């Protein structure tokens, strides 16, 4: 994420004193899941065989970072297009994608994916959904926001799960979330994250990094000093935020709302969660924009219900919301509010969404 400076980054570096192929920094940190804004599921007994990785400083195994598997025979380079399309090198599937309503200046952009195959058998299911809201018409101070929903199921409840976001400068942990600011090199951006899931009583927020822990992997540091060339921007990064549930469970969900602004902006858009008593949907409101996801990040053929509470009008200072309903099968759907039809809507194959103006109330999406 870049706004008036890099805010959420890929950390580590190929260049440096220890960044090249098969160097400790390269294979244990920089090329691994832990160095990126992704999800970890830590099985303490997992082995990451890497003997066939390129370079001279070979080792039998790489460090256990809790991340995604190393495809191929001991992390061997894929050598043909046929192999690239094989099951071994298949690491994900796009479930839905789209934007609208304008093709030139879309108000929303959606991407949903299944990344289960990127992990070993320690992960039974892993899906991630993004919605980016263009807020330039709504707010001068907060021109953009992103809602990120992750659902992860591990094969063992004891395997700890982590949601990661990397930064150059030190993040600040706050009640219910965190912020990342840019203060150097003429940059002035700020990223503000509101954590809606895990719930507050089950949430641990920790920042990791700083001198001696910039490239930290579960108790070990894999340093990579800068070259003689000046690196005042330090785009290799030095910090990350880790979100994790306190309680052990096979299945966990993460729901985060990220707002982008200038670091001098103190008043952000209000954020709240859309809940569903039957646990079929998960959703969030930021400003006057709202999104509802199918709880399993899949496509529903039957529909579902959810509620935008009356209190949302006061909290968000609006009587109308631009509502994105996702996770629907292709075809014709009816949306009801408080038992009254709002009309029929045609849902496309690629995006699986309905976008409409909506007031608080109880909603039912049905065939």
List each model region and its residues:
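Short, isolated positions in well-ordered beta-strands
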Residues: 7-8, 180, 188-189, 289-293, ...
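Beta-strand-rich recognition/accessory modules
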Residues: 155, 209-289
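Solvent-exposed beta-strand/loop surfaces of large extracellular or lumenal domains
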Residues: 14, 20-23, 173-184, 216-232, ...
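Catalytic and substrate-binding regions of extracellular carbohydrate-active enzymes
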Residues: 1-184, 248-264, 272-276
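A short, sequence-level motif marking secondary-structure junctions
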Residues: 11-17, 129-134, 168, 196-203, ...
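Polysaccharide-binding surfaces and accessory modules of carbohydrate-active proteins
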Residues: 161-217
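Non-catalytic terminal regions with compositionally biased, polar/charged low complexity
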Residues: 135-142, 175, 248-252, 259-367
């Amino acid at each position: 994420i870049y706004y008036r400076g890099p805010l959420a980054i890929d950390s580590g570096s190929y260049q440096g004193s220890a960044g090249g192929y098969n160097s400790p920094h390269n294979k244990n940190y920089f090329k691994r899941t832990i160095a990126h804004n992704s999800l970890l599921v830590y099985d303490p007994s997992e082995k990451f065989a890497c003997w066939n990785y390129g370079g001279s400083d070979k080792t039998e195994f790489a460090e256990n970072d809790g991340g995604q598997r190393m495809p191929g025979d001991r992390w061997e380079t894929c050598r043909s297009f046929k192999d690239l399309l094989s099951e071994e090198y298949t690491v994900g599937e796009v479930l839905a994608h789209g934007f609208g309503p304008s093709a030139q200046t879309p108000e929303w952009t959606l991407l949903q994916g299944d990344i289960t195959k990127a992990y070993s058998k320690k992960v039974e299911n892993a899906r991630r959904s993004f919605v980016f809201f263009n807020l330039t018409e709504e707010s001068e101070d907060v021109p953009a926001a992103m809602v990120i929903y992750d659902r992860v199921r591990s094969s063992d409840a004891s395997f700890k799960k982590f949601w990661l976001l990397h930064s150059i400068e030190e993040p600040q942990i706050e009640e219910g979330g965190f912020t990342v600011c840019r203060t150097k090199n003429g940059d002035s951006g700020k990223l503000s994250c509101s954590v809606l899931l895990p719930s507050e009583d089950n949430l641990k927020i920790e920042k990791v990094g700083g001198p001696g822990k910039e490239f930290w992997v579960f108790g070990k540091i894999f340093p990579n000093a800068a070259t003689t060339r000046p690196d005042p921007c330090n785009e290799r990064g030095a910090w990350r935020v880790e979100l994790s549930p306190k309680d052990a469970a096979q299945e966990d969900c993460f729901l985060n709302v990220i707002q982008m602004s200038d670091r001098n902006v103190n008043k952000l858009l209000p954020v709240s969660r859309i809940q569903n008593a039957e646990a079929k949907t998960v959703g969030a409101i930021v400003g006057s924009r709202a999104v509802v996801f199918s709880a399993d990040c899949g496509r529903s053929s039957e529909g579902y219900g959810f509620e935008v509470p009356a209190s949302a009008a006061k909290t968000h200072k609006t009587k109308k919301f631009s509502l994105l309903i996702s996770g629907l099968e292709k075809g014709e759907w009816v949306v009801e509010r408080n038992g009254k039809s709002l009309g029929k809507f045609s849902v496309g194959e690629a995006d699986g969404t309905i976008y409409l103006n909506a007031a608080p109330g109880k909603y039912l999406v049905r065939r």
